């Protein structure tokens, strides 16, 4: 076998097979077919040889024999020469031309291309100055979170003697129509509860400002826009009628509030916990921001020819993960999934998959160059986590899971080592701030509500829910 490197981590291999071996493979294919081919009037495997050969056709036999010969020869050559074969095997030249050259009992030569693991040597990875967007703890974060929960537990008092204003909770009748005057049911509701909060975006973003100043029973028509992916925003018409106004009466943020809505007995204890929690969150997010900037820098300064096989495999993993998440929400994938949809999802996942493969190869190479190797205890600890998550499913693929645990721990340790070897410099006037989101360690009720109250689905404290209403985003 002779080999020649090609682009994108491919190898062109030319393999020659002896006439003796080509005849052996041909005979093997014929004998297998004789044993398994059913000929009318004969039991399987008992039909005369010539009759079976006549029924199958000699061209088909030669093709099947050539196909097996190529497959076996490539596998043997790869193993014998210790080639890091990945896949994506393609014949060099046309099938018809190659079949014309194949004659059992004669020497046979063919060429194939296939993906191999790239040889990666990283040169620029230490002593770099890397700009990133830092995440810093903002003391106002905790106060904002507490105010959100204070608002959630407010008592809503109906008012009738004034128009709606910012901070009110209102109930609307909403009728949204498209450009043709057709009702958009998904964006219409007989009774829609809405908080008039300037910091809480609404899907139809023009509605809250239009409601401010309206009196109960008043109606108006507003032009609204809805953004659509890859298209210009749709211009719709919204007919709104104000049905009711309620003003929130906020409970005091005192010890009683803390005791009722958290695991702590005093507000001071709750504040102290939340401050520590969000300081740790900001620190963790800042580290993640550094890691992301580091990866981008490594990729930019250390190009690697990536094999399509690895990119496709990683893209498939991302698509399957997305589909599992969709399925976990109760969606029947059999009703929506098609080959065309899967292929489109895979293509959309390829850019992220390419970056993931590139970064993983670089980190693995750096670990090899610097001798970063996780201890057996660290690998075993990570493996035990997988076992707990997967339960009885681990027995069949234990070694595969062990390798995954090793690679994951090694990558984390390599990233930590790289953070110490490089200097990180904040991008000027572009500083991110940790937002008041809850963590698993938050006090029980505070945690639950903070998780539930996302920008897309705010919790309501009173009022009726519409059967089909647009959500706040």
Curated annotation (Swiss-Prot):
<feature type="domain" description="PPIase FKBP-type">
    <location>
        <begin position="167"/>
        <end position="251"/>
    </location>
</feature>
<dbReference type="InterPro" id="IPR036611">
    <property type="entry name" value="Trigger_fac_ribosome-bd_sf"/>
</dbReference>
<dbReference type="GO" id="GO:0044183">
    <property type="term" value="F:protein folding chaperone"/>
</dbReference>
<feature type="compositionally biased region" description="Polar residues">
    <location>
        <begin position="451"/>
        <end position="460"/>
    </location>
</feature>
<keyword id="KW-0963">Cytoplasm</keyword>
<dbReference type="Pfam" id="PF05697">
    <property type="entry name" value="Trigger_N"/>
</dbReference>
<dbReference type="GO" id="GO:0015031">
    <property type="term" value="P:protein transport"/>
</dbReference>
<feature type="region of interest" description="Disordered">
    <location>
        <begin position="430"/>
        <end position="473"/>
    </location>
</feature>
<dbReference type="InterPro" id="IPR008881">
    <property type="entry name" value="Trigger_fac_ribosome-bd_bac"/>
</dbReference>
<dbReference type="InterPro" id="IPR008880">
    <property type="entry name" value="Trigger_fac_C"/>
</dbReference>
<keyword id="KW-0413">Isomerase</keyword>
<comment type="function">
    <text>Involved in protein export. Acts as a chaperone by maintaining the newly synthesized protein in an open conformation. Functions as a peptidyl-prolyl cis-trans isomerase.</text>
</comment>
<keyword id="KW-0131">Cell cycle</keyword>
<comment type="similarity">
    <text>Belongs to the FKBP-type PPIase family. Tig subfamily.</text>
</comment>
<protein>
    <recommendedName>
        <fullName>Trigger factor</fullName>
        <ecNumber>5.2.1.8</ecNumber>
    </recommendedName>
</protein>
<keyword id="KW-0132">Cell division</keyword>
<dbReference type="GO" id="GO:0043335">
    <property type="term" value="P:protein unfolding"/>
</dbReference>
<dbReference type="InterPro" id="IPR046357">
    <property type="entry name" value="PPIase_dom_sf"/>
</dbReference>
<dbReference type="Pfam" id="PF05698">
    <property type="entry name" value="Trigger_C"/>
</dbReference>
<dbReference type="GO" id="GO:0005737">
    <property type="term" value="C:cytoplasm"/>
</dbReference>
<dbReference type="InterPro" id="IPR027304">
    <property type="entry name" value="Trigger_fact/SurA_dom_sf"/>
</dbReference>
<dbReference type="GO" id="GO:0003755">
    <property type="term" value="F:peptidyl-prolyl cis-trans isomerase activity"/>
</dbReference>
<dbReference type="GO" id="GO:0051083">
    <property type="term" value="P:'de novo' cotranslational protein folding"/>
</dbReference>
<dbReference type="GO" id="GO:0043022">
    <property type="term" value="F:ribosome binding"/>
</dbReference>
<dbReference type="InterPro" id="IPR037041">
    <property type="entry name" value="Trigger_fac_C_sf"/>
</dbReference>
<feature type="compositionally biased region" description="Low complexity">
    <location>
        <begin position="432"/>
        <end position="450"/>
    </location>
</feature>
<dbReference type="InterPro" id="IPR005215">
    <property type="entry name" value="Trig_fac"/>
</dbReference>
<dbReference type="GO" id="GO:0061077">
    <property type="term" value="P:chaperone-mediated protein folding"/>
</dbReference>
<dbReference type="GO" id="GO:0051301">
    <property type="term" value="P:cell division"/>
</dbReference>
<keyword id="KW-0697">Rotamase</keyword>
<keyword id="KW-0143">Chaperone</keyword>
């Amino acid at each position: 076998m002779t080999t020649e490197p090609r682009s994108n981590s491919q190898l062109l291999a030319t393999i020659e097979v002896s006439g003796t071996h080509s005849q052996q493979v041909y005979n093997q294919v014929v004998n297998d077919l004789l044993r398994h081919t059913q000929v009318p009037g004969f039991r399987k495997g008992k039909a005369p040889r010539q009759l079976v050969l006549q029924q199958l056709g000699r061209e088909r036999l030669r093709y099947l024999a050539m196909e097996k010969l190529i497959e076996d020869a490539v596998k043997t050559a790869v193993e014998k020469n210790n080639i890091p074969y990945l896949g994506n095997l393609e014949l060099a030249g046309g099938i018809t031309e190659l079949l014309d050259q194949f004659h059992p009992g004669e020497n046979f030569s063919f060429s194939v291309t296939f993906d191999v693991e790239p040889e990666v040597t990283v040169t620029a990875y230490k002593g770099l100055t890397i700009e990133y967007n830092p995440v810093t703890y903002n003391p106002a974060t905790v106060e904002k979170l507490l105010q959100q929960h204070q608002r959630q537990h407010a008592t809503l008092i109906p008012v009738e003697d004034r128009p709606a204003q910012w901070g009110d909770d209102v109930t609307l009748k909403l009728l949204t129509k498209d450009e043709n005057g057709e009702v958009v049911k998904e964006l219409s509701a007989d009774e829609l509860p809405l908080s008039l909060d300037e910091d809480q975006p609404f899907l139809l973003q023009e509605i809250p400002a239009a409601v401010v100043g309206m009196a109960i029973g008043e109606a108006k028509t507003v032009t609204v826009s809805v953004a659509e992916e890859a298209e210009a925003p749709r211009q719709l018409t919204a007919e709104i009628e104000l049905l009711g106004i309620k003003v929130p009466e906020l409970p005091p943020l005192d010890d009683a509030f803390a005791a009722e809505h958290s695991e702590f007995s005093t507000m001071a204890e709750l504040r102290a916990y939340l401050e520590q929690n969000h300081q740790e969150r900001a620190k963790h997010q800042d580290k993640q921001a550094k890691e992301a900037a580091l990866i981008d820098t490594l990729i930019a300064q250390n190009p690697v020819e990536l094999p399509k096989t690895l990119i496709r495999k990683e893209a498939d993993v991302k698509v399957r993960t997305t589909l599992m998440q969709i399925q976990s929400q109760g969606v029947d994938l059999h009703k929506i999934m098609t080959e065309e949809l899967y292929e489109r999802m895979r293509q959309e996942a390829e850019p992220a998959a390419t970056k993931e493969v590139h970064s993983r190869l670089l980190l693995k190479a750096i670990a090899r160059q610097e001798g970063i190797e996780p201890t057996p205890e660290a690998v075993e600890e990570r493996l035990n986590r997988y076992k707990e998550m997967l339960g009885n499913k681990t027995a069949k693929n234990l070694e595969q899971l062990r390798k995954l645990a090793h690679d994951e721990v090694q990558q984390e340790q390599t990233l930590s080592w790289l953070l110490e070897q490089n200097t990180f410099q904040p991008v000027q006037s572009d500083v991110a701030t940790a937002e008041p989101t809850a963590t698993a360690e938050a006090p029980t009720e505070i945690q639950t509500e903070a998780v539930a109250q996302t920008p897309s689905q705010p919790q309501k404290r009173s009022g009726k829910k519409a059967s089909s209403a647009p959500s706040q985003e």
